[in-house]
Amino acid sequence: MSSRTSTSSYKRMFGAERQAMVRSTYSSRQYSSPGRTTSRVSYSSASSTSPSLYMSKSARSATRLATETLDFGLADAINTEFKANRTNEKAEMQHVNDRFASYIEEVRFLEQQNKILTAELEQMRGKGSSRVGDLYEDEMRELRRQVDQLINEKASVEVDRDNLGENIERLRQKLQEEMLQREDAENSLRSFRQDVDNASLARLDLERKVESLQEEIAFLKKLHDEELAELQMQIQERHVQIDMEVAKPDLTAALRDVRQQYETLASRNLQESEEWYKSKFADLSEAATRNSEAVRLAKHEANDYRRQLQSLTCDLEALRGTNGSLERQMREMEDNFSIEASGYQDTIVRLEDDIRNTKDEMARHLREYQNLLNVKMALDIEIATYRNLLEGEEYRITTPFPNLSSLSLRESMKEIRPAMDSLSKKVVIKTIETRDGHIINQSTQKDNLE
């Protein structure tokens, strides 16, 4: 009764009885290469006819043999040995059932863990990688946009710098021309100053000559006056003598003629001296006026050149200041651009590290999942093996045995061994190729081993 109850409960738990016992082995190998991982999973199973059939056949033959040749004197000893064997088998079955229950609990726990890890892996595949990839792409687009903007700004600043450089070069050339013109004006001014100095010296010389001539005229006039005075005195003395001497000739007309001649000569000399002085003074005045006008024009041009030079110097200083400020701004922009580019590069490296870490984490989860799957498959194989063993044992236990001799049991075991030796073996080789944590190829190969 207990045997039937255990059989029905086993059928409710594991299904109908199997008439074939499966012996399976499992092995897994992984070959890794850069960027590619190959997993090779091998299954070997052996199927044969259940030993219970051989046992039933041997039991039938033993029954016929026992009915024909059984010695009733040994029945009690055989029954006692059979009861002891049944007790030992029950204890072993209880131990096997306990181990089987623990294996079932462990398998359930591992299946739950496998489901959790599978859900996490699917979530990471569905959301994590896409979210990180989208963030990476958005960040890269933003960085590229900023880099393009900075490149455009740098190009515009370089164009402005080139334009300012051209303006500075043009102003420098203009400054050189103005400086040459200033040097020419200064040379002209120096020549004009030399002419003015020469004219001044000539004027001073003429003034001295005029003074000397005036002094000479004054001296001659004084001398003339003195001579006239002497002549008048002589004339008076002679007039007195003439008055006293009646017979002396009349000298008045001669003196008058001499006086007129001297007066005419003196007036002519004075007039010529005045005309010569006036002409010389006019020439000197005209030369001085002309030279003063040239000096005034030269001074005016020099002042104009000085003002232009000052304005150009101010413009040059302003342009130098503008150029210096633009160069400082350009250096600051280049420094900021270098700093931002290095920051963007660090961000890119950090994002690549995050992506690499995420891929490594996914690969690690895949490896764990693969390991758990391997463990699950090994446990499934072991459970199937235990199930087949339990089915065989339960079938053997529930089969009614009459009182048998030890000879019949030995013969039945001898019949089972050849049957076990004649098992056919099948090897299943499953190859899985992964790259960056994703399965890219999967193949299965079956081989039969004798």
UniProtKB/Swiss-Prot annotation:
Expressed in low amounts in retina, optic nerve, brain, and spinal cord and in very high amounts in eye lens. Pfam families: Filament (PF00038), Filament_head (PF04732). SUPFAM superfamilies: Intermediate filament protein, coiled coil region. Residues 232-254 are annotated as: Linker 12. Residues 89-397 form the IF rod domain. InterPro entries: IF_conserved (IPR018039), IF_rod_dom (IPR039008), Intermed_filament_DNA-bd (IPR006821), Intermediate_filament (IPR050405). One of the most prominent phosphoproteins in various cells of mesenchymal origin. Phosphorylation is enhanced during cell division, at which time vimentin filaments are significantly reorganized. The keyword RNA-binding does not apply. It comes from the Eukaryota. GO terms for cellular component: axon; cytoplasm; intermediate filament; plasma membrane. Keywords: Coiled coil, Intermediate filament. GO terms for molecular function: structural constituent of cytoskeleton. Belongs to the intermediate filament family. Vimentins are class-III intermediate filaments found in various non-epithelial cells, especially mesenchymal cells. Vimentin is attached to the nucleus, endoplasmic reticulum, and mitochondria, either laterally or terminally. This is Vimentin beta.
